[in-house]
Amino acid sequence: MKALEWMGDSLKILDQTRLPVEIKYRMAATYEEVAEAIEKMEVRGAPAIGAAAAYGYALGAIGYSGELAGLSAHMEKVQHRLAETRPTAVNLFWALRRMEDRLRDQHEAKELAEIRQALVAEAESIAEDDRRVNRLIGEHGNAIVTAEANILTHCNAGALATVEYGTALGVIRAAQQAGKKVHVYAGETRPFLQGARLTALELMNDHIPVTLIADNMAGFLMQQGNIDLVIVGADRIAANGDTANKIGTYSLAVLAHAHGIPFYVAAPTSTIDLKVPSGQDIPIEERNPKELREVFGVQVAPPEVPVYNPAFDVTPAKLITGIITEKGIVTSPYSVNLLKMMVRS
């Protein structure tokens, strides 16, 4: 199953809200359809959101039928619509900046067709970069996995969250392919259940041993000595190493620290936002209260109960053992070492 696939004039998006019960695709032919798919979490995961937004931007140009002189104003509208879909995942904004830069490079183009072709090529490049980068993350991350390891992960940072292979699950895949005996504990990840619905499905399809647990069982497993390592993905990493990821990640980091268990973040360098000094400056998306009052249409709480539903939390850098990127593994002091890595790249 691919999270997304370019079909030449539309974007084929796997509707992940239907998994694992049903495999259904959306054929997005306009940028508005791509924006809706991102908002509704049909496509999710920071790298996949970035790639989808890039294709959505290209579709904005493909769908434009006005004069060449009016394209710039139209594409500003397209970019704004895509940018407002999910505020926390920085890959979204990184991809849109790349697309905007490619559009500016076409200022001497005389035909719309030439510009459209260039934008599609840039979106394809972003997608291909993600495939390559995730494999490198896996290669680097394999070094921190012992010959036999029980690994805890949270949410879904696998192939379904990227164009291909995955970040946190990419490390696990690389370890298995290297002949290591890995067993994964997947937290269910309330309220949207990405761990139960997506991570468990991915790992089972790849014949990687996995056990599903409720989110509130992690501490007990650590206390029993059943967790050797925690690996999670990321939606935005601040300049000081503070990391925004799916809600519940911070709790796991605190538990891992209390039990002396290594806690790693796996993410591409496109997730690092040096313009954001610390986690306090990362915008945190708050989602629809219905996601807590209901579970897939079944009411599980009083309909009038007040709800607080942040989609992400921020793990302080001091709780992170290392950040696994395609450039290597970065360790503390993050303010220094992340900057060094980004300057070199």
UniProtKB/Swiss-Prot annotation:
Task: Look up the EC number in the record and give it.
Answer: 5.3.1.23
Q: In which pathway does it act?
A: Amino-acid biosynthesis; L-methionine biosynthesis via salvage pathway; L-methionine from S-methyl-5-thio-alpha-D-ribose 1-phosphate: step 1/6
Q: One biological process GO term for this chain? A: L-methionine salvage from methylthioadenosine
What this protein catalyses is:
5-(methylsulfanyl)-alpha-D-ribose 1-phosphate = 5-(methylsulfanyl)-D-ribulose 1-phosphate
A GO MF label: S-methyl-5-thioribose-1-phosphate isomerase activity
Q: Which SUPFAM superfamilies match?
A: NagB/RpiA/CoA transferase-like
What class does this enzyme belong to in the EC scheme? isomerase
Quick one: which residues bind substrate? R44, G45, A46, R86, Q194, N245, K246
Keywords, comma-separated and alphabetical? Amino-acid biosynthesis, Isomerase, Methionine biosynthesis
Domain of life, per UniProt, equals Bacteria
| InterPro entries for this protein | IF-2B-related, IF-M1Pi, IF_2B-like_C, Initiation_fac_2B_a/b/d, M1Pi_N, NagB/RpiA_transferase-like
Q: Which Gene3D superfamilies does the annotation name?
A: translation initiation factor eif-2b, domain 1 (1.20.120.420), Translation initiation factor eif-2b, domain 2 (3.40.50.10470)
Is Manganese one of the keywords UniProt gives this record? no
Write down the position(s) of the site called Transition state stabilizer.
C155
Active site residues according to the UniProt entry: D235
**TM region(s), chain numbering:** none
Pfam families per the UniProt record, alphabetical: IF-2B
What PANTHER family has UniProt attached to this entry? METHYLTHIORIBOSE-1-PHOSPHATE ISOMERASE
- Main role? Catalyzes the interconversion of methylthioribose-1-phosphate (MTR-1-P) into methylthioribulose-1-phosphate (MTRu-1-P).
- Give the protein family: Belongs to the eIF-2B alpha/beta/delta subunits family. MtnA subfamily.
Entry protein name: Methylthioribose-1-phosphate isomerase
Q: Which organism is it from?
A: Desulfitobacterium hafniense (strain Y51)
Encoding gene per record: mtnA
